[in-house]
């Protein structure tokens, strides 16, 4: 039951405070650890596919295991000092593992620039939350990028961490964040990371496999509660959920596209290189800046469903 209270408290903390810039965040330290490990291993292992595969596997093992051990020991030690201190530490870290408010704030900043309209400012705003090249995006392209990142990050930034913290408290949620951070830094299929990042990418695929599909189903439910097209969300999810190189990324994107009646994804540039990605959804109408706000509403409702169902199940199981 204490875990459910920690998750609920963390959800409220994220909803109220988000991630203040002045507060150190675990993901920052995870990123530094990944960079240092990568630099260390690349300097000592053979510069061959086998050497890079080994180096990447070492990172993919050390960071999650180290995160789980460190956070688990801290939570255990705090609980030994006093149960309420243990609960407070778990609440704090659970809040940091969630990104709902930060995602909503950043995407809403994009919306505000689009409706001014200030396209250069909107491109700069969206560049903070997407990995693609943004300098030549049209208004439609900026809007699509923002909606896509809300949909995708609703899964790996909110619902997946919620599910993991309900299973294993803050330590397991932060271990998931370590896996997700590795993938975001190393999981590129370019010359530099094709081999070194493979283990991180595969581990992220496994960690997100079930949460991403649950998130898509919750998104369909959220579409109904926010007066979007739930039937369309279900239909497009069933049809287009595999339209991505990742087995997980198109799950919530397809549900979102169907709920809004717009087309997402498609070709994009990353680091100056053209990627001919398939589209997701049908262009029943042109995408518009207000779709960013609609996506955020569905993200919050889907997250609320995940919290409610998860806490109820956790409470029932004890």
Predicted regions and their residues:
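Hydrophobic alpha-helical transmembrane segments
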Residues: 1-175, 179, 187-318
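Glycine-rich phosphate/dinucleotide-binding loop and adjoining beta-alpha-beta core of small-molecule
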Residues: 184
């Amino acid at each position: 039951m204490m875990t459910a209270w920690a998750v609920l408290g963390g959800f409220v903390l994220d909803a109220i405070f988000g991630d203040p810039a002045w507060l150190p965040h675990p993901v920052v330290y995870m990123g530094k650890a990944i960079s240092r490990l990568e630099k260390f291993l690349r300097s000592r292992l053979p510069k061959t596919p086998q050497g890079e595969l080994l180096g990447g596997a070492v990172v993919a093992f050390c960071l999650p295991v180290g995160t789980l051990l460190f956070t688990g020991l801290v939570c255990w030690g705090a609980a030994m000092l006093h149960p309420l201190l243990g609960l407070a530490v778990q609440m704090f870290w659970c809040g940091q593992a969630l990104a709902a408010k930060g995602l909503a704030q950043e995407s809403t900043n994009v919306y505000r620039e689009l409706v001014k309209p200030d396209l250069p400012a909107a491109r700069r705003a969206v560049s903070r939350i997407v990995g693609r090249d943004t300098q030549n995006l049209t208004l439609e392209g900026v809007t699509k990028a923002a909606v896509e990142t809300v949909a995708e990050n609703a899964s790996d930034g909110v619902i997946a961490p919620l599910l993991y913290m309900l299973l294993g408290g803050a330590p397991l949620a932060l271990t998931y964040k370590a896996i997700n951070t590795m993938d975001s830094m190393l999981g590129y299929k370019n010359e530099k990371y094709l081999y070194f990042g493979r283990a991180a990418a595969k581990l992220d695929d496994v960690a997100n496999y079930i949460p991403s599909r649950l998130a898509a189903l919750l998104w369909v439910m959220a579409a109904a509660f926010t007066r979007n097209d739930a039937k369309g969300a279900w239909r497009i999810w069933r049809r287009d959920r595999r339209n991505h190189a990742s087995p997980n990324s198109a799950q919530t994107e397809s549900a979102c596209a169907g709920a809004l009646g717009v087309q997402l994804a498609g070709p994009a540039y990353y680091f100056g290189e053209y990627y001919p990605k398939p589209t997701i959804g049908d262009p029943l109408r042109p995408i518009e800046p207000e779709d960013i706000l609609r996506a955020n509403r569905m993200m919050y409702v889907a997250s609320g469903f995940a919290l409610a169902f998860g806490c109820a199940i956790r409470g029932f199981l004890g």
